[in-house]
Amino acid sequence: MSDLTSTILFEHPLNEKMRTWLRMEFLLQQLESQRTLDNIASALTFFRTASDLIDVLERGEVRTDLLKELERQQQKLQLWADMPGVDMSLVDSLRSQLKSRASVLMSAPRIGQSLKEDRLISVVRQRLSIPGGCCSFDLPTLHTWLHQPQEQRNQHIDKLLTSLTPLNQSLTIILNLIRQSGPLRAQISLNGFFQDNAEGADLLRLRLPLDPQLYPQISGHKTRYAIRFLPLDSENGTVPARLSFELACC
């Protein structure tokens, strides 16, 4: 199942902290891909995503949780360093990166504050919950801004995204290390069902063949999880008695 073009990768968090991190990663990636705003549709998509990120950041102690995880990953690398045959140059490089990310994150302004204080984002956020509430008569500020030179708009967006760099860099290295901590292993589900112990994992990663058009419904926590495979076509689709897939507990 190594052909990535014929498979699809799903990820499922096993705790609230990981759920928040995956959502932040998803939103940060969207913001980065939408940074060129040249029409009302792209602008609204960007500002809606920025609004979602503000909401996610306000729900917990994001900086504290990330700093704790950066420290935890450094401790794990220290354990690796004591094992025979380990690539010490790689371990030292990762530890240096983790320390650097932690230092930058610690000294950074409050995460997301630049987004919250941005006047344009604030004005747009007030209208997002209103159906059709972003017309030119609702948001003349936005429509005027969209008629500014592209370079001026780019500078505005670049400044906002740069303010998120400490968050983005810390989150990226943490999630990369967590994802790499557990290899994908071949598994088989019986009659569309699979369950196992999570053993304190944070994240499940599951790779499925695109055919026969199934998706996983996952429930679980840090000690145990269950996966039920369901057909995309709920009326005519079928689930094979034995389904091969790959699974990683990270």
Curated annotation (Swiss-Prot):
Q: Name one GO cellular component term.
A: cytoplasm
Q: What is its main location?
A: cytoplasm
| Cited InterPro entries | ZapD (IPR009777), ZapD_C (IPR027462), ZapD_sf (IPR036268)
Q: Does the keyword Cell division apply?
A: yes
Q: Which UniProt keywords apply?
A: Cell cycle, Cell division, Cytoplasm, Septation
Which BP terms does GO give this entry? Answer: division septum assembly; FtsZ-dependent cytokinesis
Subcellular location as annotated: Cytoplasm
Superkingdom per UniProt: Bacteria
Q: How does it assemble?
A: Interacts with FtsZ.
What is the role of this chain?
Cell division factor that enhances FtsZ-ring assembly. Directly interacts with FtsZ and promotes bundling of FtsZ protofilaments, with a reduction in FtsZ GTPase activity.
Q: Which family does it belong to?
A: Belongs to the ZapD family.
- Official protein name in the record: Cell division protein ZapD
> Which organism does this sequence originate in?
Yersinia enterocolitica serotype O:8 / biotype 1B (strain NCTC 13174 / 8081)
